[in-house]
Each structure stands twice: as structure tokens, then as C-alpha cells.
Amino acid sequence: MDHLKRQDEKVFAAIEAELGRQRSKIELIASENFVSEAVMEAQGSVLTNKYAEGYPGKRYYGGCEHVDVVEDIARDRVKEIFGAEHVNVQPHSGAQANMAVYFTILEQGDTVLGMNLSHGGHLTHGSPVNFSGVQYNFVEYGVDADSHRINYDDVLAKAKEHKPKLIVAGASAYPRVIDFKRFREIADEVGAYLMVDMAHIAGLVAAGLHPNPVPHAHFVTTTTHKTLRGPRGGMILCEEKFAKQIDKSIFPGIQGGPLMHVIAAKAVAFGETLQEDFKTYAQNIINNANRLAEGLQKEGLTLVSGGTDNHLILIDVRNLEITGKVAEHVLDEVGITVNKNTIPFETASPFVTSGVRIGTAAVTSRGFGLEEMDEIASLIAYTLKNHENEAALEEARKRVEALTSKFSMYPNL
């Protein structure tokens, strides 16, 4: 980044500092990952200069013949990965992908069934502080009080009672497999559409390690980062009969010109997803998550639902007599990055919380394996149990440094 260094030392310094943070800390935020240098090169390309309102073959600007190729590559690769009939890769985020689906089939005030945020849902699944909860009448379903797993009988009962126009499946903090076939059966029984938000598990679905929602849902939304290991962005997969409506909802509905440099980066990431070694990577994500969960439980920590089926683990820290906020802070102090998170039947403020959410996608990209998961489990437990002991925290910092020093990060940057 020689040009940037000469042009703007302040921005360059901030980027260099962030690179140092990523190299020196253990990244366990479940929604984060490390993209390839090829993805970064595509996103930093001259495509950032091009306006391309519209879609391939039907643009409102001239000179789009090359970006048309890029967008077609991205769409075709997604169709191949997931078996989708239609794909829109223009959403700038997962939230905008969800918004576009809502705008396609809902009217203001329509009833929607979505997962409670503290039970694992997402802001865009009906939170009252989000546009979704303001514009529409969301009814919440959740998890069983004992198993912390989705109670499908309860979902059916609520669907029969409230007759939603749309049912939203998918989550941002649910560590178990979701039965999309069952959700579609429930939707069909009450005459509702089904939308699946697979943002967190898309990479696992792509690798065949989690049930694919595409054959069951009318609409599937996702981010393109997280387990897909692409640039930050979103996309929509749907049945062909909804293609024109979905495309109109994105443009001109809620967006103007697409970010063609980001779409190029998405295309590159999708190409990586189609490679055989991506399946190995995704399997390692799950293996690492299972090993980490086992290690945490051996250390006496409480896990929501008792474990994980995917990349995500939710730790209930109440038995340690600390809050999620304190846990996040003290772990960051020793070099482990996590996020505080609400847990099912939460009683604390969302700014405080009773839980911590972690995931294994990023550390797996870095090359961490089962032995490293054992050490991370030990480190997390040691740090949280000794959160007021500065000598213990200094020891944890040294252990984190010893671990991260074994795995290089972006050596060419």
C-alpha cells in the first residue's frame, strides 16, 4: 500500500494497526472471517469506479459490458453452489437482502412469524428497534426452556393462531441445525411464505454440511462473509417466479448503483467455495467448534443448548458471576476477541447480557486445529475465572501471544 502510505498517513496507520490486531489476537467473533488476498484484490480493483444501475444486459449506464461479465459469473456460481433458480448478488448487506424480500411480499402491518432476538434471532427478524419490527406485526417464536432448541410444535401453534403472511427461519445466535423442511410444512399448513436467513451457516450449507434451505424456502437470504469467507455483503436466492419482483425490490426499490468491486470480490469468493478444499475447510470449522465446545464444558462452562452443530457456540456466563459485557472486555484484554450476546430467556440489558457468542470460522481460516481448540478453551476458562487477577491475565496474554505467533496472517501485506 505504498500509494496510500504516501497519500494519507493517518488512514494508512489505522489500517496497519488493524492488521496488527488481526495478527496478534485470536478472532472468535462468529460473524467474522479472513478473506483471501484474491478477494481483497478484486474488491480493491478499478471496478470501484464503475456505475452500473440495473442488471446485466439492462443497465441505465453505458460501458457496462465488463461488469456485466463479473455479475453473471457471481450469479452463475451461486446457482451452482446452492441449486438456486434465481440469484441477486447486489444487496449491500444481509439486512438489505431481508428488507428486499419483505418489500416484495408484505404490506405495512402484515403479520410475520420470526425468532425472538434473545433466543437467537436477528434484528431484522422483527426487533422493535429495527425497521422490520416497526413496519410489520412480528410475532415471536423461540426455543424450549430446557433444551434451548427450536420447539417446532410451538412454531406451528403460533402460526395457526396468528396466520402470518411470512415465516422467517434462520438465526444469528443459534448453535443447532435448523429443520427447514419442517418450517416449510408449517408455512404450507397456514398458507404463509417461507424466508430463510442463512447468513451464519451459508458456508456450511455450500459444503453440504448443513441442510440446504433452497429446496424448501420461497426466499433465501444471506450475507457473503461469515462462513462463506467472502467480502461483506448480501444476496438473495429465490424461485424463478419471484425473480422480477425481487430484482425490482433491490433496484430501483431500495438501492441505486451496485458496488461492482464488491460483486467482483463476491464472485472470487464463490469460485473459492466451489473448490474441493473449501469442503475440507468447512468440515474443519465444525470439527473445531465441537472440540472447543467439549473443552469449554470440561472447564465447567455452561453452553446454551449443551453444545453445537455448526460453527457457533453460546456461553452462559452467569455461573461465573460475571456478565457478558465483562467477559467480552476481559477476554479482549488478553487478546481473545468475542462479543457479548443475549441468551434465551435473557433478563439482563442487551448492553450487558448474560452470554458470550463465539465461532470458529476465522480461526479455522488461520489454520488453527483441534490442539489449538483445546488451548483456546483452557484460555477462555482461565481468563474468565481469574478476571480480577492481573497476574493471571498477564499469563493469559503470554499464552495468546505464543499461540498466534505460530500462525502467520497475510504475510504479503
Swiss-Prot record:
Gene Ontology process terms (BP): glycine biosynthetic process from serine; tetrahydrofolate interconversion
EC number: 2.1.2.1
Single GO MF descriptor: glycine hydroxymethyltransferase activity
Residue positions, PTM N6-(pyridoxal phosphate)lysine: K226
InterPro entries (UniProt xref): PyrdxlP-dep_Trfase (IPR015424), PyrdxlP-dep_Trfase_major (IPR015421), PyrdxlP-dep_Trfase_small (IPR015422), Ser_HO-MeTrfase (IPR001085), Ser_HO-MeTrfase-like (IPR049943), Ser_HO-MeTrfase_PLP_BS (IPR019798), SHMT-like_dom (IPR039429)
HAMAP family to which the protein is assigned, alphabetical: SHMT
Subunit-level organization: Homodimer.
Stated name of the protein: Serine hydroxymethyltransferase
Lineage: Bacteria, Bacillati, Bacillota, Bacilli, Bacillales
Gene: glyA
